[in-house]
Every structure is written in structure tokens, then in C-alpha cells.
Amino acid sequence: MSSSAIKIRNALLKATDPKLRSDNWQYILDVCDLVKEDPEDNGQEVMSLIEKRLEQQDANVILRTLSLTVSLAENCGSRLRQEISSKNFTSLLYALIESHSVHITLKKAVTDVVKQLSDSFKDDPSLRAMGDLYDKIKRKAPYLVQPNVPEKHNMSTQADNSDDEELQKALKMSLFEYEKQKKLQEQEKESAEVLPQQQQQHQQQNQAPAHKIPAQTVVRRVRALYDLTTNEPDELSFRKGDVITVLEQVYRDWWKGALRGNMGIFPLNYVTPIVEPSKEEIEKEKNKEAIVFSQKTTIDQLHNSLNAASKTGNSNEVLQDPHIGDMYGSVTPLRPQVTRMLGKYAKEKEDMLSLRQVLANAERSYNQLMDRAANAHISPPVPGPALYAGMTHANNTPVMPPQRQSYQSNEYSPYPSNLPIQHPTNSANNTPQYGYDLGYSVVSQPPPGYEQ
């Protein structure tokens, strides 16, 4: 075995290590770099190793190998694409689909990879074997194929409003049927006790069932039916089982939602609405939780007794104690409810952390906008002499900076010194009056034409 083959083998085993719980893209790119050094020989070597890894029983190895295959097809040229689209390799992939020992989750992962490769190879007729394999999977195992993502049609006027209303009606009817079946089951349990009350309830439901639908049909959350991984900046990526909080409808078949602090749009055919609990169900849940919390003292006492017995070595005496048996018998039935409560509060914690992240992002964006607005209103600085250096007017005269106003420090004089002083006399009493030549004779008297 050559040194290059040894390097490829070691790199591939590292990238498809069963201990990896997710794809390590650094390891995958290392394999791609080694293959690109000699696509002819190294390509055959890596495909031989990939085929052996796909025959392993470890699902983790197969998942990592599928990711490596996609990366090789996208980064290592036409020679690797020919090998991946060969009849031998496509038959190996279909064998995983047909195998009864392969879990359905792994089969869906294989189907997703086949679809991705089929879309990548569709422009090359020589690679149509991968497209034929995907068509075969759709015929033989349609349950493995995810629905196509709908196009983003803008909502305009009446036509889009009617489509939105039809979609809302469909969601409302699905929720109403679920609630109706639940009510029928509850009525069947109570029929043996109170038959007249059951008849009255049927009459009330038959009289006005449609009036109760809108109050129960507000879709606030949806659950993902499939995995969706996207590179679009405005789209939301999620995994099967994730609960997405609905924010608004952006397109006809796309809604906007929030998940783990991220916001984006998602296709409606990838999710299903979550039935919001009624007031009665919420009250029952609170009562069950209250029962669990009321047993806290008993649980602590049992825990302390068992710990003390394990330290002293008196386990046999503790097991024979009827009080310990009674406490154990009262605590054990609470385990399913405790498990549900742990999941519930873990989800609430995740929602609160997601909301905190959304608020932090919104606050950061708001502060950035406020800073930009404040900077836009700041007046530009006054240009200094350096700005005018080298500038000339149209007549080639240099442009000089504006001169500063000079302030003289002369002493203050109450009267101007350059006005001639006159000494007229008042015609009434011949007393001399002093004034300045301002256009009338005496400053102390009003000017001519002035009316008091």
C-alpha cells in the first residue's frame, strides 16, 4: 500500500469515526484535499473505502460516510462524480433502502443524500443514474421522500386572502375533529353514570358547534414533521420534532417563526399544528403537579432513609420496614408524571432562553439604529486652513481661509468721539444744551415730527 493510500485511509477513518456524533467538516475537507492531489488513483481508493464503510452495521459510521460522499461529489471534480454515480455505488445505496435491518431514520438520510446528489448531477446526462435511483426510491418507498418545499408566492389581495382563509379553515377543522373525538371519548365514559346530561350535551353540540371552533383554533405553535436544513438567510432550519413558535404569515405557503433564538420562514407542508390545551386540561395538569409537589416530604424522607441504610449496612432491616414500603409504594406511581414535568419545564426553559436571545438581538439592532441616527445629525467640523491649501478661484486667485474677527480692547466711551459737539441754546430759557450733531439740535429733546 502506497503512502498516499495510507494517508487517505487514515483520514477517512478519522472523518467517519463512530464516536463522532456530528459531522466534523475539518476532517471531511482533509479527505477532499488528499483526493484532489491525484483524483484518478486517490479517487478509486477513497471510493473503495467508502463502499466498505457503508457496509458497516454502525449507523453513525454510515451517516458520517454519507456526508463525506456529498462533500467529495461537490469538491473533487468530475472523476469522483462518475464513481459516485456508477451502477455499483447506486446499487449499494439502494441496498440500504431495501434492508430490513436498517432503521427508517437512516433510510431517510440515504434518501436525502440521493436527492441532493440527483439535483447536483441533473445537468450532466452521463450522471443520470443517481436521478434514476431517486425516482426508483419515490416509486418503491414514497414514505421516505420529503415533500418539496413550496415556492414563495407573495400575498396580494383577494385571491391570497381566500387561500389564507382556506388554509386557516383546514387547520381549524383538523383541530376541531381532534377536540370532537376527545369529547366523544369523555362522553362515552360518563354515559353509564349520567345519561340525560349526555343527551343535553349532544343537543348543544348539534345546535352550535361552529361557534366554538374559532376560540380553539388559533395556531401559535407547530411541530416539525421533517428535517429542513437551508443556507438561505431568511429561512429557518430545524429538525424533526422541534416546536416552532409562529410569528406571522409572510408568503402564501410560508410562515415566519422562532426557534432557539433564531427567526426565519418555514414551509407549511413540513409542519403540523399543535393543539393548545383547554382550560380544563390546564387545570388537570396543575392538579397533577400539585400532587407531585405534595409528596416532596415523603420523597426526601425515603431518600434519606435509604442513604442512611446504605451507609450503615442495614439494608435488610430497611426493606422489612413497613413504613419504608408504604413510602416507596406512594412514590413509585409518580415517576411518569415527574418525567413529563421534567420535559415540560426543560422546554419552557429553552423557550425562555430563545426569547432572551431574540430580545438581545432586537436590543442590539435598536441601539445600532439609534447610533446611526445620532451620527447623521452631528454637524460636520469647521474646515481649517489645511483644507484651503492649493485651492483657487476661477480667476486663478488662491482661496484663503476666512479671517477671524478681531476684538479691540479700547476703553469704553459713552459717546462717539468723532461727532462735533455743538452748544445751542434753548429758546425758552436761553440755557445752554450740550449734544451731538445727529440731525436735530438737542439730543435731550425728541426729533422733529415725533408725536408724543
UniProtKB/Swiss-Prot annotation:
The terms under GO molecular function for this entry are: phosphatidylinositol binding; protein domain specific binding; protein heterodimerization activity; ubiquitin binding
The record describes its membrane topology as: Peripheral membrane protein
A biological process from GO: ATP export
Q: Which positions carry N-acetylserine?
A: S2
Question: Which Pfam family is an annotated match for this chain, by its short name?
Answer: VHS
Q: Which domain of life is it from?
A: Eukaryota
Keywords linked to the UniProt accession: Acetylation, Endosome, Membrane, Phosphoprotein, Protein transport, SH3 domain, Transport
InterPro entries, sorted: ENTH_VHS, SH3-like_dom_sf, SH3_domain, STAM, UIM_dom, VHS_dom
What CDD domains does this protein map onto?
GAT_Hse1, SH3_GRB2_like_C, VHS_HSE1
Which parts of the sequence belong to the SH3 domain?
217-276
Q: Which residues fall in a compositionally biased region of kind Polar residues?
A: 393-433
| Limits of the VHS domain | 15-145
- Residue positions of the PTM Phosphoserine? S162
UIM domain segment(s): 162-181
Q: Which Gene Ontology terms of cellular component type are present?
A: endosome; endosome membrane; ESCRT-0 complex; protein-containing complex; vacuolar membrane
Intracellular or extracellular location(s): Endosome membrane
TM region(s), chain numbering: none
Misc remark:
Present with 358 molecules/cell in log phase SD medium.
Give the record's subunit note.
Component of the ESCRT-0 complex composed of HSE1 and VPS27. Interacts with the ESCRT-I subunit VPS23, the UBP7 deubiquitinase and the E3 ligase RSP5. May form a complex composed of VPS27, HSE1 and DOA1. Interacts (via SH3 domain) with DOA1.
Q: Which family does it belong to?
A: Belongs to the STAM family.
The protein's name in its UniProt record: Class E vacuolar protein-sorting machinery protein HSE1
Q: Which organism is it from?
A: Saccharomyces cerevisiae (strain ATCC 204508 / S288c)
- Please state the gene responsible for encoding this protein: HSE1
